[in-house]
Amino acid sequence: MSDVFCPTPWLEMFIRPNGDVIPCCEMISFDTTCGNVNTHSFEEIMNHSVYQKIREELIAGKKTRACTNCWKREDQTGGTSLRTKRVSNEYIQDIGGEGLGAEVFTKQIVTDIKSMKIDFSNGCNLKCPMCNYNRSTAWRKDKLAFEKDFDFEQYEYHGLKVKVKDWDEIFKTIPLSFIDDNIQYILQMGEINISGGEPFFHPQFHHLLDKLVENNYKGNLTLITNLTLLEDDTLEKLEKLESRLSISIDGCLDLYEYVRSATTHGKYDWNHIWGKIQQVMEADIHISFSYTPQLYNMYNIIPWLEITSEFRQRQRKKQLLNEVLISPNYLRIANHPDKAEKDRLIQSLGFWDHVRGVKSIQQALAQPQPEDRWIQFCKFTNFLDKQRKTSIIKYVPQFEKYWITE
């Protein structure tokens, strides 16, 4: 097996809110659409020429362009990406695959999908500053304000400048009928992975959950959720399945309500989310945390590791950290203008180097970044704070001595 191989194009599909299917969520930036669940059958999608080309290139040992995001992340973080996580017998077995060798996949029936990732909708009750209008409907008001009043100058700001021509396209959703029409395929999958938007915000998710419970689904149900909308009856249903919750959090204590901002700022504070986490822990549902290291939470990482140390004691392999943020580039953790501060954090993280993800933070902090990235970060945050009537300095006072106001 070559060192560029990835099993994903044989095992997985990612369904976007408009129904388009791509082989992997990391391929979203490229022309890799393999059909649409509203107009194509599963067999047509999995036999699509894009799927076939990617498979052929990976078997030939080529770095297929579709996988650029993983190559880029491996360069940025010292070798860690979604691809490197997929190339493991543990993962293959977990989703019900037959093995890792390329010869296994050349013989596989193409419709025998083992993992489906689906975003039913971009609907979300939060408008996190590191998110965008493509992932949260709550971002619409801010996006329109950026289009109207923000001075972009020489900075691109990753799509904020581009005017949305069709909001109906952005807000499309997968119909409930998709679940009923394809339940025979869904039930045979080893893993169903749902994100969004926010899954608990979507009626399609609750319909699927009822169907899985009704049919005694035996695979893994994985949710990427902010957890704020979890209700008791939903938790009871999740307990009946092999459920796994990846909790998107990105900040603890006072910072939480800033980086996980509700449409009404402060609606969900740390006490609220901590209570939800404890509730899930008591239900004995497997949880991990999607805490993405970035500039906003640079001074929050150590407190987060301290708070969650008890989880490590209960379950040694529990994920506490996500991959380091690399996009948008103005939010990268290495953009902090003070090298001494970054070196101090690198040293402090040495105590936690046994935690998966810490070394990639240290490596990211050591990466040189253009000096104007800090200016770009301040400019973006100043505008967003004005729009939302918030203040980053209130939550991260350590920034004040470096801050650039408009």
Please report, for each region that a protein language model flagged, where it lies by residue:
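Radical SAM enzyme [4Fe-4S]-AdoMet core and its adjacent flexible, acidic
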Residues: 1-40, 44-45, 119, 140-143, ...
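Short, intrinsically disordered, charge-biased short linear motifs at domain edges
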Residues: 11-14, 49-60, 112-119
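Local cysteine-cluster metal-coordination motifs and their immediate loop/turn environment
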Residues: 23-26, 63-75, 123-133
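Iron-sulfur (Fe-S) cluster-binding segments and ferredoxin-like electron-carrier domains
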Residues: 28-35, 74-85, 134-142
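Membrane-interface junctions of multi-pass transporters
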Residues: 28-72
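Recognition helices and adjacent regulatory flanks at domain boundaries
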Residues: 77-114, 124-126, 147
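Core AdoMet radical
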Residues: 113-123, 134-174, 186-202, 213-231, ...
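Distinct, well-ordered alpha-helical segments
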Residues: 204-210, 231-238, 300-304
